[in-house]
């Protein structure tokens, strides 16, 4: 009886994907008011829901993915040496470059094409870029004792489970919803999708 009560109380603080996504506004890790509409930051404008407003649900998902990614990056970077930090930065630069390619591909819409399809494709493409980068960060962090320790603490010793969810997402062309939902339900992230570490 006491065990059941304890489990019930633990789950009270946990969220779900639905609770995260259906908030009025989901803010990414960066300040949207500072992003310029100059054609160079369209990936960030989409995450901020300034581009593709008809695609708000998917844009919110991108903001959640952005928060998870930046939170993981910041937490594991604190214990990383210069070489590993350099590797982490390279992973981030690659991910940002991939995000920008996703937006460029969206802008190549053909006349008569359903206008929502390019937005959905861009969102899927950007989620894939985040999934790849998250997986690469985790795999690189596991190769170093200090960052591996932090990674295990962040994921409460379930790193393999979350690597598998990311791999499944990439192998099945699914979005990050299951990954985010699992993080939320296991109380690893807060209401902004930042790790509670």
Where is each model-derived feature located?
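N-terminal alpha-helical modules
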Residues: 15-197
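Classical Sec-dependent N-terminal signal peptides that target proteins to the secretory pathway
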Residues: 1-16
